[in-house]
């Protein structure tokens, strides 16, 4: 049965997490009216599966002033009903990039749209850092799939660009580029070798996640040289 926005908000209230709310108050977006029920992404994914795909409800939740509701809106949207115009509107309201990860990466609905590759290419070359971040987030998701136009030559050029430009970028774009490099390098043997060479040339990528956060920057080289990845290529 289709749920209403009110029912979803009631569901979120039932799952509110006081510890998460305190964390939000410390880490939330400055100068924003956005509120939070303090619910983690893992729990929100479970709720999204419970609710099911619903484009109309997704747009209603996106219009909410609760972070958790906006995330659910992104998770339950229907890829075939999302338009370029909608994506361009939403990317303008990611709360300074706070919602960028769920919007463009992290198994994002946007990466499942028919225009995802075209959008990723356009956004990676944008003058807007939030769009660039999202473009690389999409590239990471797309690197897991077969996509028309995204051949090895295209990805080798992107590896070179990441290698040469990553340390010139803003911090969160840097993080997205680093993640995309890892995704590309797991695609096949040729791209793996190129991505490893790039990762060695790049060296450490510093990301400031804050003093009260245990997150550490992604070690791309470690991932790309792991026994699991090596075994994957030996079997192909």
Residue map of PLM features:
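Alpha-helical scaffold domains
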Residues: 1-236
């Amino acid at each position: 049965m289709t749920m209403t926005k009110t029912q979803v908000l009631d569901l979120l209230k039932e799952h509110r997490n006081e510890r998460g709310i305190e964390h939000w108050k410390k880490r939330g977006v400055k100068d924003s009216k956005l509120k939070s029920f303090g619910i983690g992404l893992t729990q929100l994914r479970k709720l999204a599966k419970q609710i099911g795909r619903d484009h109309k409800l997704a747009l209603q939740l996106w219009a909410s002033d609760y972070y958790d509701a906006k995330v659910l809106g992104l998770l339950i949207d229907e890829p075939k009903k999302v338009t370029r115009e909608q994506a361009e509107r939403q990317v303008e309201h990611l709360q300074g990039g706070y919602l960028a990860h769920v919007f463009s990466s992290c198994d994002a609905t946007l990466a499942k749209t028919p225009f995802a590759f075209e959008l990723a290419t356009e956004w990676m070359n944008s003058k807007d850092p939030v769009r660039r971040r999202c473009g690389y987030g999409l590239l990471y998701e797309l690197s897991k799939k077969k996509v028309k136009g995204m051949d090895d030559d295209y990805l080798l050029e992107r590896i070179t660009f990441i290698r040469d430009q990553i340390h010139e970028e803003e911090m969160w774009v840097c993080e997205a580029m680093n993640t995309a490099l890892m995704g590309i390098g797991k695609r096949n043997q040729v791209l793996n070798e190129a991505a490893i060479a790039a990762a060695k040339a790049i060296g450490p990528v510093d990301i400031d996640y804050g003093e009260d956060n245990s997150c550490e920057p992604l070690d791309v080289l470690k991932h790309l040289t792991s026994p699991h990845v090596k075994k994957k290529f030996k079997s192909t």
